[in-house]
């Protein structure tokens, strides 16, 4: 199984870089959108939850950072599974012409979602600096849950991609 991943690593790299270029090709701000989008969403959620629902007195220190962490992980899971779900159907013309393992396409979408998530962590760092949250070496502990979420999202994406071939709704 690992031999198959290693054999198609260049194809995977080319597919991820193609998606990256296609996403930001016609955009004026380019990659800045990957940072700006989570920042603006966090600002809206923070305004709603802190003022309208009075979450300031809930005992959560640095509520904006707390909110941003959850938002980034959810956005990654959402993007990885929703794009992975339709990836095999989207690659059907290529799959009919050349033999490529079908798992490459959901894996590529999950890798691309991880690239976007890494850019979004810049937004988290900006929120941490703005709110005065301390940066500790323990921030490296986020790597294990992120890798676990990657594989979980990949599994869900593979399952949904297989189901979408039969049930296109």
Regions found by a protein language model. Give the residues of each.
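Hydrophobic transmembrane alpha-helices and immediately adjacent juxtamembrane helices
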Residues: 1-168
